[in-house]
């Protein structure tokens, strides 16, 4: 049951509400304690020793207070960072609610980070202690932290240790979370968000959207990402039936869709790409009305595969709501720093706004395509994408140097290359480090991948990387030249083997370049087949093109 109009008005006018005090405000609103509010996937152990799959609001209060009591008894105070290193989305959610209720700052560490990276990242945060799951216990054992706890140490009786001032009263500028960037360019950057920045978009959505398509919401986002927390906050306010999934594997998300029957599914583009590569005709996706992507913009081929399933409501010519076949895919471009997907591009099976179009910025944000000296460029010219938004992080945790280097002309630079059309729509071309300067022109890797996936139905996915000689920089910021390679994953092994027999990599290269040439894009040097397991991915599922470049260059050198 979603909130009433009266509840919505009360929430939107609540000047005390923020990301750090949501549970306290729900109590003030008089929400019933026996109402189910959160579903988990069984990966989290509760203080009573059970592994509940559903928590009521009253049970969530009790759990959060037990965790908060344990932390308070072990010296955690307001503004203390506490590291959380786990693979369980529910553990991140519960710890976020508990630590913020004390005024402390949960510092999320993705469970997929390499151990040495996780240790160094936590050291840079200045964390006073850590919570881990059992599988990550050893990673931070010798990290010199004040305490190190797992779920089995926290008991219901720890509620008695809550401080007299509980819950903490936040200022809008108080930090309530440190999550981290994907780490695709090296060490992940600590990205804090405040009581205000993490809640701003959620209240905006409540003002302007009924949210009826989110009545049953499946969250396939990484638990360690602030997008999961933002979704949790919104769903708790909206009173949706929300389930947190710890796995971002496409097959696991599809299994859960069939079991949970959600109306909305949230995930990153990599997860949606894996889902689209499955035989979806063998899946029951009829419950889905909306797929919501955030992070990197998704590829057309993957979107089209998903919107063919499910259904959604639209308003007909007589202004009546009617249900039609096919779901909606909301393609959001965002980042940890942006705090919310500033761009939303809505797709159905009957729309065609593709070609890396990401649309226009949401009403509360401002975007521009900038020249190298920070001047907004006219339509058609390629430049750096810059953002201004009340949801933007106030900076990188303990790294103001990097933060200030990513500001230009009053905008925060996303690291993306883009251009606009005459109607003000933005188009995403590539990440600046992933563009490849070649003798034939600049190969924008993401744009090239988009075209190949749309034109070659045999491809399940593809990755374009650049390789340059030692000491030569051939990306957007470089002045040298390299060679671009298209690394292909195919859907039909039989057809692929037949193509190999007819010419192997040379045949694939010819096919790929014929598509690129017809579109007026620079060709690649070679196209090569590869298996999904050969693709290096980061903690959040993004392809690590930096790693792929280095690996491929080494292989070419020894070939």
From Swiss-Prot:
For this UniProt record, the keywords arranged alphabetically read as follows:
ATP-binding, Ligase, Magnesium, Metal-binding, Nucleotide-binding
Recorded E.C. number(s)? 6.7.1.2
Q: Binding residues for Mg(2+), per the UniProt record?
A: 181, 337
Q: Which domain of life is it from?
A: Bacteria
Q: Does the keyword ATP-binding apply?
A: yes
Q: What class of enzyme is it?
A: ligase
The UniProt family comment states: Belongs to the ATP-dependent AMP-binding enzyme family.
What name appears for this protein in its UniProt entry? 3-aminoavenalumate diazotase
Q: Which organism is it from?
A: Streptomyces sp
Which gene produces this protein?
Answer: avaA6
